């Protein structure tokens, strides 16, 4: 966009485009209604409310550079080079528009369509909520050759909007300090958490320059992002450590009825599908109509091409969606003037018209691509045919295992020590390494709600295995059968027999490896239970401090374990009998009472819940650590290794 056009349109973005729906009240009383929670998540949500406003300016074509700063005192500054929030008088409030934006709830440039055609956040809604939940917020607006300034305290205006200088730039700078009375859990920002989302925004908004700078003492760093390839660069980033079947991602984009659709995709030699979708920069974790349109088009276009080019014989069945998505990495990004979000976490796009639009736009572009690139097209079809053969083999294996008491719930694995309760909300399944630990766990558990499934040795590394090989593995079959969720296309998280799946392995290298193999299996083939928050890692103690024959205190593993051990030894050194240390290398070294007391008793145990905040990053790490390529793994280990004395 030229400066002349930008200046002309900037004149049209004025107070008349800031609509007021209701006053700013109750935000401080019920902050969770506006930002989800006042935890760490809610704290970081404040940043996105302000950044989204700058992104809206970028989507509208007026901003090209956004900067985010974590200040030394853990306050936040967001700077953009957009048009600047309007500073003229807003008709309904009789106050400057910028003041209205920051002090009136539901005042913003999104409503009515005059300000923004497409919006990620609701411009103004976020601003006023952030203001209400901050001890202090100030805004500098560069507009009409002047710098306009206003300051607020906990949502209230300190002084009228004033001009504090001249400028030849345009844009908005917002600085805010979250209120510790609201955010009682923490007011400390996590650089990595902010950085990941900022990089994601750079991928999703092609050509946008966005940076994040940490100015806190000892943590100083800056990351700059700028991707001319947009979501095609995102696919390359995700597939960085994977073997791909063609070098450059396929990229298509189109617009219909003011709705733009972008798709970037690339096939790897692996077995896992990784499709990520976004609507107006919001990650639609639960999918939606844009994903539906893409999946339908992908399957139809590949089958049509395979038939026309005799790559599928007349007597052969069409490839299924599962077949054509094996090894696929894809990013779908839709920009919609009026998105409707639904689903449990409001991360599912619900607009019905998007199915047809995505389907049509992607079908046309993808069909043309296949015709123009016959070698790549042939590789894609051949990969789908191989996947179909593996699917048929896996189906046969599944039927055989069902007959042999495999995946039917009515025939649970013989080694499963089940619990008596049938209420999944209270039941727990402990996956225990080895028979000896399994014996202690079975004896020590609460039989009412705790079930035990021992596994022998290291399970199959599913990162390197096809579906039929996975289903042939007895330990994996036992886990799926016990959980009751089904497998593959039949997987249904609502059928889970337990809402706590606890990985309980030894605190040594082998135990860590088994845990990693189990997490890889869960991430790749049971991901919905991970997303539902059902997966936990038990934290058995690493030391016991004994006085005579009695264990006085247990020390959990962690960075401070040696300090805690020395403190415990000092506490019990004053008596006649000197304390001794018992080191637990394996769960089998504890008797059933100790295992219950330290690791299984809900009153005293420590467990870590496993979550996936960043699916793309998790996908990269699992592939790097568990996949075929050695070099990326070696580099990762060299960069992240902690050199220490091993107790072996």
UniProtKB/Swiss-Prot annotation:
SS bonds (residue pairs): none
Requisite cofactors: Mg(2+); Mn(2+); Ca(2+)
Catalysed reactions, semicolon-separated: ATP-dependent breakage, passage and rejoining of double-stranded DNA
Entry's Gene Ontology BP terms: DNA topological change; DNA-templated DNA replication
Family recorded in the similarity comment: Belongs to the type II topoisomerase GyrB family.
Oligomer and partners: Heterotetramer, composed of two GyrA and two GyrB chains. In the heterotetramer, GyrA contains the active site tyrosine that forms a transient covalent intermediate with DNA, while GyrB binds cofactors and catalyzes ATP hydrolysis.
Name this protein carries in UniProt: DNA gyrase subunit B
Species annotation: Streptococcus pneumoniae (strain ATCC BAA-255 / R6)
């Amino acid at each position: 966009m030229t400066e002349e056009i930008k200046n002309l349109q900037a004149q049209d973005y004025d107070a008349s485009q800031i609509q007021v729906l209701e006053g700013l009240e109750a935000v401080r009383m019920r902050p969770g209604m506006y930002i989800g929670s006042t935890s760490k998540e809610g704290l970081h949500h404040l940043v996105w409310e302000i950044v989204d406003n700058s992104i809206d300016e970028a989507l509208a074509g007026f901003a090209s550079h956004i900067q985010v700063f974590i200040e030394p005192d853990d306050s936040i500054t967001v700077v953009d080079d957009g048009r600047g929030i309007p500073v003229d008088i807003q008709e309904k409030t009789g106050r400057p528009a910028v003041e209205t934006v920051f002090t009136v709830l539901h005042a913003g440039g999104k409503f009515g369509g005059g300000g923004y055609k497409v919006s990620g956040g609701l411009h103004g809604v976020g601003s006023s909520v952030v203001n209400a939940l901050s001890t202090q917020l100030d805004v500098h607006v560069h507009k009409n050759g002047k710098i306009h300034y206003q300051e607020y305290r906990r949502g209230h205006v300190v002084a009228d909007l004033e001009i504090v200088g001249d400028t030849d730039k345009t844009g908005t700078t917002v600085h805010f300090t979250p209120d510790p009375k609201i955010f009682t859990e923490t007011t400390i920002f996590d650089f990595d958490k902010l950085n990941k989302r900022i990089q994601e925004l750079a991928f999703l908004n092609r050509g946008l320059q966005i940076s994040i700078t940490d100015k806190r003492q000892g943590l100083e760093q800056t990351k700059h992002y700028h991707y001319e390839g947009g979501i095609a660069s995102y696919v390359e980033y995700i597939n960085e450590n994977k073997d791909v079947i063609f070098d450059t991602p396929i990229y298509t984009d189109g617009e219909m009825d003011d709705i733009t659709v972008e798709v970037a995709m690339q096939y790897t030699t692996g077995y896992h599908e990784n499709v990520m979708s976004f609507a107006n920069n919001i990650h639609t974790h639960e999918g939606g109509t844009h994903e539906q349109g893409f999946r339908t088009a992908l399957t139809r276009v590949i089958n049509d091409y395979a038939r026309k080019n005799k790559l599928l014989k007349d007597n052969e069945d069409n490839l299924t969606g599962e077949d054509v998505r094996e090894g696929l990495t894809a990013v779908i990004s839709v920009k919609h003037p009026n998105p409707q979000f639904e689903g449990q976490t409001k991360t599912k796009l619900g607009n019905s018209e998007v199915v047809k639009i995505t389907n049509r736009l992607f079908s046309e572009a993808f069909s043309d691509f296949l015709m123009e690139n016959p070698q790549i097209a042939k590789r894609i079809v051949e990969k789908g045919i191989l996947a179909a053969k593996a699917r048929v083999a896996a189906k046969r294996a599944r039927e055989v295992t069902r007959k042999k008491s495999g995946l039917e719930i009515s025939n649970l694995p013989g080694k499963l020590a089940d619990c008596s309760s049938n209420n999944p909300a209270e039941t727990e399944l402990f996956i225990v390494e080895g028979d000896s630990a399994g014996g202690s766990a079975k004896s020590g558990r609460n039989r009412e709600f705790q079930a035990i499934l021992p596994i022998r040795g290291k399970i199959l590394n599913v990162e390197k295995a096809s579906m039929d090989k996975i289903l042939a593995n007895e330990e994996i079959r036992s886990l799926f059968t016990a959980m009751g969720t089904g497998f593959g296309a039949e997987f249904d998280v609502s059928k889970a027999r337990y809402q706590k799946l606890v990985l309980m392995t030894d605190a040594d290298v082998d135990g860590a490896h088994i845990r990693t193999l189990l997490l890889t299996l869960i991430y790749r083939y049971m991901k919905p239970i991970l997303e539902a928050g059902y997966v936990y890692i038990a934290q058995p103690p690493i030391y016991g401090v004994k006085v005579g024959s009695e264990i006085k205190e247990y020390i959990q593993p962690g960075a401070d374990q040696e300090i805690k051990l020395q403190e415990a030894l000092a506490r019990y050194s004053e008596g006649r009998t000197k304390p001794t240390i018992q080191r637990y290398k394996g769960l089998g070294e504890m008797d059933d009472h100790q295992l219950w007391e330290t690791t299984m008793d809900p009153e005293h145990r420590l467990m870590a819940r496993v979550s996936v905040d960043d699916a793309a990053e998790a996908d990269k790490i699992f592939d790097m650590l568990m996949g075929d390529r050695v070099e990326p793994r070696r580099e990762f280990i060299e960069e992240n290794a902690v050199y220490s004395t091993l107790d072996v």
